[in-house]
Regions:
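Acidic, Ser/Thr/Pro-rich beta/coil linker or hinge segments at domain junctions
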Residues: 235-278
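Generic recognition of flexible, low-complexity loop/linker segments
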Residues: 1, 50-54, 120-123, 133, ...
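Carbohydrate-binding surface patches
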Residues: 195-235, 241, 284-287
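Flexible loop/turn segments at secondary-structure boundaries
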Residues: 18-23, 69-75, 140-146, 184-185, ...
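Catalytic cores of secreted or luminal carbohydrate-active enzymes
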Residues: 121-138, 143-194, 285
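Noncatalytic carbohydrate-binding groove/subsite architecture in carbohydrate-active enzymes
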Residues: 1-121, 127, 180-195
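Conserved, mostly hydrophobic/aromatic
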Residues: 12, 47, 67, 134, ...
Length: 293
C-alpha cells in the first residue's frame, strides 16, 4: 500500500484487540491484558519499518491506531456471526440485545483493564514520532469508557486511565531508560508467549516552559509493590503522585460503588533522594517540578 499509493495517503491504520480464550483463567486474562500493549509496540515497530522502507521518496506516512482494546470473553458470551445483509448498526444492535438477555452485555472494565489502557498510552508516547492519532471504541455502554443507567453514570477503569493521562502529562514525549525485574508469560488467546517483560513500564512527558516532568509508571506485578530510584538529571523542588489504583486487579466501579477505582493525588516529601514505591497493579503519573539550572 505504501509503495503503490503512498503519495496519496495521509495515514495508515492499525487495529488490535487482545482477547483471551473463552475458558482462560483469571491469571491468564490478567497477564494477557498487561502484556498486550507490548505486542502492540512490536506491531507498531514492524509497521514503521515497512512503511518507511516502501513510502515514495522517503515520505513519512504516520500511523493512526484507531481501534484497540482488550476483550474478556466468557464462554457464555453471545457469538454473533457477521451477515452481509446486516448493516454495522444492525449487527451491533443484535449483539447488544443478545448480551442483555444473557446479562453480559457490558464488559465493565476492571482495574487491570485500566492498566492495559495506561500501558497502551505509554506505547503511544514511545512512538509519538510515528503514531499521530489513536481512537477508542466505544465511549458509552456496551464496551464503553462510561456506563450509564437509570441510577446514574460512572467512569470505568479505562475512563480513569484516560483521565490520568489527559490531566497529568506534558505536551512533549521524552525518552527514558528503565532497569526493572522481568517476567515471562505463556501464549494466551491471540497473543504469543513473551519473555523478558519488565514489571515496570515507564514513559515520560515534559512541559519545558513550566519546568514540569511527568513519569508515567505502570507496575504490572499483581501483588507486589516495587521500590525504584529515579534520576532525572536535575534537582526536584516538588513531587506529586497521581495514582490510578483499587483493591485488586478485578475491582470494578459500579452504580453502588462508583469510586472503587479512582485517581488520587498526593504531595510527596520525596524530592529525588532515596527510593520511591509504586503499588502493585497500579498506574501512576509522577509530576515533578524541576529546579532552575
Amino acid at each position: 500500500v505504501a509503495r503503490i499509493a503512498g503519495e496519496h495517503i495521509d495515514n495508515i491504520t492499525l487495529h488490535h484487540y487482545a482477547q483471551a480464550d473463552e475458558d482462560a483463567s483469571r491469571d491468564d486474562q490478567y497477564w494477557l491484558a498487561v502484556t498486550a500493549p507490548s505486542r502492540i509496540g512490536d506491531l507498531i515497530a514492524m509497521s514503521r519499518a515497512t512503511i518507511d522502507a516502501h513510502a515514495p521518496g522517503g515520505k513519512r506516512i504516520p500511523i493512526s491506531f484507531d481501534e484497540w482494546n482488550v476483550i474478556h470473553r466468557h464462554a457464555k458470551y453471545p457469538r454473533v456471526i457477521a451477515n452481509g445483509d446486516w448493516s454495522a448498526l444492525e449487527h451491533q444492535a443484535l449483539f447488544t440485545t443478545l448480551g442483555e438477555q444473557m446479562g453480559v452485555a457490558h464488559q465493565d472494565y476492571a482495574l487491570v483493564d485500566g492498566l492495559y489502557a495506561a500501558l497502551f498510552f505509554n506505547v503511544l508516547l514511545r512512538n509519538a514520532d510515528h503514531v499521530t492519532m489513536a481512537n477508542q471504541a466505544q465511549l458509552v455502554n456496551l464496551f464503553g469508557l462510561i456506563e450509564t443507567g437509570p441510577a446514574g453514570a460512572y467512569g470505568t477503569a479505562e475512563y480513569h486511565a484516560f483521565r490520568l493521562y489527559v490531566e497529568q502529562s506534558g505536551p512533549t514525549a521524552v525518552a527514558v531508560r528503565v532497569d526493572s525485574p522481568t517476567f515471562e508469560v505463556r501464549a494466551t488467546g491471540n497473543l504469543p508467549a513473551r519473555q523478558g517483560e519488565p514489571y515496570l513500564d515507564v514513559a515520560a512527558t515534559q512541559d519545558i516552559e513550566r519546568r514540569k516532568l511527568w513519569l508515567h509508571v505502570v507496575n504490572r506485578h499483581p501483588r507486589e509493590e516495587i521500590a525504584v530510584r529515579i534520576d532525572v538529571g536535575a534537582g526536584i523542588t516538588e513531587a506529586v503522585h497521581h495514582l490510578l489504583g483499587g483493591r485488586g486487579p478485578w475491582t470494578r466501579n459500579s452504580f453502588t460503588d462508583p469510586e472503587a477505582i479512582a485517581v488520587s493525588s498526593t504531595h510527596l516529601d520525596w524530592v529525588g533522594a532515596g527510593p520511591l514505591t509504586f503499588p502493585a497493579c497500579s498506574a501512576s503519573s509522577l509530576e515533578l517540578t524541576l529546579a532552575e539550572p
